[in-house]
Amino acid sequence: MAKQIWKPGNMVYPLPAVMVSTGDKKGNQNILTVAWTGTVCTNPAMVYISVRPERYSYHMIEESGEFVINLTTEKLARATDFCGVRSGRDVDKWKECHLSAKKAQTLEEAPVNIECKVKKIEKLGSHHMFLAEVTAVQADEAYLNEKGKFELNKTGLLAYSHGEYLGLGKKIGTFGYSVKKKSDRRRKRGKK
């Protein structure tokens, strides 16, 4: 297989396309679409988002020290795109996209809301990374199975890659499935 050499760039794709909600001390609220996001640490639970300093939400997050990562779905694709290309300086994104906010600016329509408190801001270049501790997680009960397990694969999650939004959802394995013995797999499925 032949490969081309490209200039250095971020090729870690696909990425989650999340809607980050925040507010300032004056009561203004905004939603920002972010693809530069992920897990930093398990214990304590920490995440990050990277935002350009010129974005309207940047100073809200910097001032309040808080934000909410709202996972997006295929049903939220249009709103996710809108909140990434329109500025909260010019338009009320909540109103324009017919979105509902609950406490702490959590997006009601999102299957998962991850409430975060900023611990550190790393000024890296074009984007500044907000390192944050997770203070609460809300999960939509509609996606809980009979055992109370959250079935994220049924939410129709949205991903982003090179300017395109992609739907996710098909489960192809579970953690450790590649090394489990066949007898363990049969037992788990209820076969002997």
Each PLM stretch: what is its role?
Residues 1-192:
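Basic, polyanion-binding surface patches
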